[in-house]
Swiss-Prot record:
Protein name: N-acetyl-gamma-glutamyl-phosphate reductase
Record-level Gene Ontology MF annotations: N-acetyl-gamma-glutamyl-phosphate reductase activity; NAD binding; NADP+ binding
Swiss-Prot/TrEMBL keywords: Amino-acid biosynthesis, Arginine biosynthesis, Cytoplasm, NADP, Oxidoreductase
CDD domains with a match to the protein in the record: AGPR_1_C (cd23934), AGPR_1_N (cd17895)
Function summary: Catalyzes the NADPH-dependent reduction of N-acetyl-5-glutamyl phosphate to yield N-acetyl-L-glutamate 5-semialdehyde.
Similarity-based family: Belongs to the NAGSA dehydrogenase family. Type 1 subfamily.
Lineage: Bacteria, Bacillati, Bacillota, Bacilli, Lactobacillales
A GO BP annotation: L-arginine biosynthetic process
Organism annotation: Streptococcus thermophilus (strain ATCC BAA-491 / LMD-9)
Catalytic residues as annotated in Swiss-Prot or TrEMBL: C146
Reaction catalysed by this enzyme: N-acetyl-L-glutamate 5-semialdehyde + phosphate + NADP(+) = N-acetyl-L-glutamyl 5-phosphate + NADPH + H(+)
PROSITE patterns: ARGC
Length: 340
């Protein structure tokens, strides 16, 4: 299968290159960006020498359609919404890593503060959390966000089984700096990040409606959640710490059983006896989940960790590609966590 990447110079686009280089069923045939056009990717990023020597091209939808069988959009929010229409009209498959096709138009505009994609285009897309969405044969995939992936995988088994008081959910989520993308900002300057820890977008992070929307598919009465996001002084990784109260007569063993039922046959979710750490998933497509119960407060704490650029973006995108095509779900994704 031949694929193209739009948004090659961003972190997620570069991670896609590395993954696809080891994918037995995929050939990367073109890469596109608005910067460094005409230069070889390996000249711009020497660590990719011998991995990808393709020249960066301007975006041209028709040329991509002629060369490839599918396109990945690894672009900032607000880009894919304006570029995807030509592909949809041509019935040409898309996996969009941005948030542009995850939410209804009015919700997207409220939370992203950008013009949404046309409703007829949005209706074509399937929001695809790999462990829960049947995407075989689908053509247009909205890849979940990084915070959303970690949080949803932690909560869905408990919400679906009716084990927790859904109005008690509080999520304290933390991300490494790459989660904010490559665009420079005050919060991304080294001197502001190093030896520092800060909360940002409190109550206003754009992944909040995505998480609630997904959980409501498992419990229609699911209310809003309290969700905070903070910036860790690390390069990559997300830790979502979820607090919730158990319903009456629910035992800790019921929680363990719910996670086992949900994930025992899922190759990229590991339910751990010990509490998860970022180092154990960095550089991989794994999600590690652990939990602990406080009998005095009746609060269950669930911790979910992922690599935001892999399971939270490019890794899950390739996982969805594999599932779309009916291939082995793990193809191209046999990355051992780097740990250090």
């Amino acid at each position: 299968m031949k694929v193209s990447i739009v948004g090659i110079t961003g972190y997620s686009g570069l991670e896609l290159v590395k993954i696809l280089n080891n994918h037995k069923k995929v050939e990367l045939v073109s890469i596109h960006a608005t910067k460094e056009v005409g230069r070889r990717l390996s000249d711009v990023y020497p660590y990719l020498a011998g991995v990808c020597d393709l020249k960066i091209e301007d975006f041209n939808a028709q040329e991509i359609i002629e060369k490839a069988d599918l396109v990945f959009f690894a672009t900032p929010s607000g880009v894919a919404s304006s570029l995807a229409e030509e592909f949809v009209q041509a019935d040409f498959p898309i996996i969009d890593l941005s948030g542009d096709h995850r939410l209804p138009a009015d919700v997207y505009q409220e939370w992203y503060k950008k013009s949404p994609a046309k409703k007829m285009i949005l209706n074509k897309f399937t929001y695809a959390l790999s462990e829960y969405t049947d995407v075989k044969g689908k053509k247009f995939i909205a890849n979940p966000g990084c915070y959303a992936t970690a949080t949803e995988l932690a909560l869905i088994p408990l919400v679906a089984a009716g084990l927790i008081e859904t109005d008690s959910i509080i999520v304290d989520a933390k991300s490494g700096l790459t989660g904010a993308g490559k665009a420079l900002s005050e919060s991304s300057h080294f001197v502001n990040v190093h030896d520092n820890y800060m909360t940002y977008k409190l109550n206003h992070h754009q992944h909040i409606p995505e998480i609630v929307q997904t959980l409501q598919a498992f419990d229609a009465d699911m209310p809003e959640i309290q969700f905070s996001t903070s910036l860790l002084p690390v390069n990559r990784g997300i830790m979502a710490t979820v607090y919730c109260k158990l319903k009456k007569d629910v035992a800790v063993s019921d929680i363990a059983s719910a996670f086992a039922k949900a994930y025992d046959d899922k190759p990229f979710v590991r339910v751990q006896e010990n509490l998860p750490e970022l180092h154990n998933v960095i550089g991989s497509n794994f999600t590690d989940i652990g939990f602990a119960y406080n009998e005095k407060t009746n609060v269950m704490t669930v911790i979910s960790v992922i690599d935001n650029l892999l399971k939270g973006a490019s890794g899950q995108a390739v996982q969805n590609l594999n599932l779309m095509q009916g291939w082995d779900e793990t193809e191209g994704l046999h990355m051992t966590p780097s740990y250090l």
